[in-house]
A protein has these predicted regions:
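Conserved acetyl-CoA-binding loop-helix of GNAT-fold acetyltransferases
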Residues: 103-117
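Conserved catalytic-core motifs of GNAT/GCN5-like acyltransferases
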Residues: 130, 142-162
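Short hydrophobic/aromatic beta-strand element in the GNAT-like acyltransferase core
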Residues: 39-43, 53, 89, 94, ...
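A short, internal acetyl-CoA/4′-phosphopantetheine-binding micro-motif in the GNAT/acyltransferase core
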Residues: 93-103
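Conserved beta-hairpin
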Residues: 37-55, 68-70
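Conserved GNAT acetyl-CoA-binding A-motif
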Residues: 111, 118-133
Length: 168
């Protein structure tokens, strides 16, 4: 398997993760997001198919997006002179694993790859990884160290974060 950064001339290999929204993003929107400089998408391919994909964009964590207890915990993890009104993050905008490859820890491998990339090759400075997790995926992200930004979450997704500083 190889990780490839999506380009405008990329030819997609077969992919279906079972979530039509994710399939549509990869096959129809990912190149548009890249062209508009909104997100960078990476595909993981083997000889015959797209095994998985994920897209990354810039983000931030601020008091407005979190409850006070979470914000206090985040802010207190930094020395007082480093307290800010928000902190830089990288957002996993989309992550999908081909249905044929699910339950093989590929999603966890992707999260580990993103975490290590931003620890070892952090070009712009970010200290968190964020995701708006589908409710059905919250336990997956929790098992990979992500925490909810708010105690009360309404809607289809749950904003979550991972603190990269715990890896250094």
């Amino acid at each position: 398997m190889k990780v490839v950064r999506l380009t405008q001339d990329h030819v997609f290999k077969p992919f279906d993760c079972g979530e039509s929204d994710l399939n549509e993003f990869l096959l129809h929107d990912a190149k548009l997001y890249a062209k508009g400089l909104l997100a960078v998408t990476y595909v993981i391919e083997d000889d015959d198919s797209t095994v998985a994909f994920f897209s990354l964009s810039n983000d931030r964590i601020s008091l407005l997006e979190s409850d006070k207890a979470t914000w206090r915990r985040i802010r207190n993890s930094f020395p007082h002179r480093k307290h800010r009104s928000d902190y830089p993050a990288v957002k996993i905008g989309r992550l999908g694993v081909n249905a044929n490859s699910q339950h093989q820890h590929i999603g966890t491998d992707i999260l580990d790859f993103v975490k290590q990339t931003f620890i070892t090759n952090n070009r712009t400075g970010c200290c968190f990884v964020t995701v708006d997790a589908l409710r059905s995926a919250v336990s997956f992200y929790e098992s990979n160290g992500f925490k909810p930004l708010r105690k009360i979450n309404e809607g289809d997704t749950v904003p979550m974060y991972y603190d990269l500083t715990q890896l250094i």
